[in-house]
Amino acid sequence: MNIEIDTPRPAGAPATENGTDSSLVHPGAWITLLLALLIASCAAPDTQHHIVISTREQKLALLDRGNVMAIYPVSTSKFGLGDWRGSRFTPLGQLQVAEKIGGNAPPGAVFKDRLRTGEIVQANSPGRDPIVTRILWLRGLEAQNANAFGRDIYIHGTPEEWKIGSPASYGCIRMRSSDIIQLYDIVGIGAAVTIVNVPLATAVPGLVTAHSMSAANPAPFVMR
């Protein structure tokens, strides 16, 4: 049996589309909503995964409990390194994944101000350089990268895939659409991100370095 709470409707207040009073609320609906909000707010941060980015080598390593899962080629800022407000530099140091955006978007989906525009841009489309496919929005955890979140520093997809492997961004970390989809599906909010200006092998002890991701061999190295 449904129990309804009948709250008097103010004079002139409209009824719902089906002619019933919108103030008649099922308590069960409120409970379900409150539980959903509670679960969302209490979701545990991702402490399992760690992203390490080498601006020196233009590579990104994904670690699972300290073990390397994959290494991807990336593209960091063509303007250099730093975190000054209004700059187009890639910040260094310890950060974390603050927000994930675009989980259901198709490859090449264009984002403006973190909202989908409805446009799809194919890889290497001439003259096009929007943010596409997925966004991992980063928050700095140190004084040297405290402006990263406000500067909209992301790990995101790019249609300029031919530039991956060399500095070409305006501060963000760019990836190929297929690679950012893989990364997005694995890491959660709160995952640690470390950006360094040294080789990955220096930042990640025990890293396998035999695989070269040069322009002649740009494929990601994936360890399963």
Where are these regions (language model features)?
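Bacterial signal peptide processing site
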Residues: 43-45
